[in-house]
């Protein structure tokens, strides 16, 4: 069933496989007229179908299931047993079909093309926003085979001291010779994402950045080589952090998360984490974004790959690139 605002119902009729009788609409009187709320209409629907005494699963940690939604359900359905479904749909998406893998491969090609544009475009004196304009053009233009879509996260572009922070976006400031820039982006095909990140160095890089980037790539490669069905997320993490330990590099944040379908504000699936102690077993066609964010006070480097669990892995990682 699809429960949707009347103004947006056309999207459900056009974009889904649902029969019309399974699309339930509510009108404008429920929109932003507190205390009236769309869930008042949802409660009426549940009562009409005699579901008000059943177990009702809700996604307690969903981006769009608010505290007010929850309170409405509790008040309107006092005899129902409302339970956290604990990311039920997310876990159902965890293992991809071959068709889904096909979409992600197409998204990967778009990511590669857009990153190439980023590498060719970023230069001293250019505004960050102008570079992102070219990157976004490439992401939407896609490939001759398939066009792109908007990503769940906009292109990220921390620059200079900003490389020591995460998830910064472009400004109208200009790129500076001698500084590094991190580019994180994703191609999208039928809402399937395949993100990647690279570090661009303008001018001659400092030795500490070269060393950090080499260690980052080595750690990523070690983790990727451990990405095989039957291994756990912890196995991948142990290989990754084993390399960092060798170079005495400290990293507290996770280094990967499952990916697939995504809508704003996130392209992660909120299931698997590549982190020590996550014992989730990798199955064939499990996909995750393995992202190595290395931050060292006032500077940082980063590289990432989208990885698929198969019986073999082979991937050549980049190095920090002078432009």
Go through each PLM region and give its residues.
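Conserved AMP-binding A3 loop
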Residues: 320
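Active-site neighborhoods and metal-handling regions in enzymes and metal-associated proteins
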Residues: 1-317
């Amino acid at each position: 069933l699809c429960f949707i605002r009347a103004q947006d119902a056309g999207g459900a009729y056009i974009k889904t496989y649902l029969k019309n009788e399974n699309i339930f609409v509510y009108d404008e009187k429920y929109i932003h007229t507190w205390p009236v709320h769309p869930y008042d209409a949802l409660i009426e629907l549940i009562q009409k179908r005699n579901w008000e005494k059943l177990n009702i699963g809700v996604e307690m940690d969903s981006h769009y299931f608010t505290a007010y939604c929850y309170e409405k359900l509790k008040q309107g359905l006092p005899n129902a047993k409302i339970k956290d479904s604990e990311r039920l749909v997310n876990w159902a998406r965890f293992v991809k079909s071959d068709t889904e893998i096909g979409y992600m491969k197409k998204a990967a090609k778009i990511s590669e093309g857009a990153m190439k544009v980023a590498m060719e475009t970023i230069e001293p004196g250019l505004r960050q926003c102008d570079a992102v304009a070219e990157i976004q053009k490439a992401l939407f233009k896609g490939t001759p085979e398939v066009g792109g879509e908007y990503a769940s996260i906009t292109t990220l572009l921390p620059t200079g001291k900003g490389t020591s922070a995460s998830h910064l976006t472009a400004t109208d400031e200009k790129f500076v010779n001698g500084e590094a820039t991190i580019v994180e982006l994703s191609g999208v095909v039928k809402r399937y994402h395949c993100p990647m990140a690279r570090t661009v160095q303008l001018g001659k890089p400092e030795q500490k950045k070269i060393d950090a980037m080499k260690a980052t790539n080595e750690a990523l490669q070690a983790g990727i080589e451990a990405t095989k069905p039957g291994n756990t997320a912890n196995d991948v993490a142990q290989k990754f952090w084993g390399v960092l330990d060798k170079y005495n590099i400290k990293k507290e944040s996770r280094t990967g998360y499952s990916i697939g379908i995504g809508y704003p504000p996130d392209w992660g699936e909120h299931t698997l984490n590549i982190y020590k102690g996550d014992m989730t077993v990798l199955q064939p066609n499990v996909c995750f974004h393995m992202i190595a964010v290395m931050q060292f006070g006032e500077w940082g480097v980063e590289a990432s790959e989208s990885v698929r669990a198969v019986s073999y892995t082979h991937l050549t990682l980049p190095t920090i690139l002078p432009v």
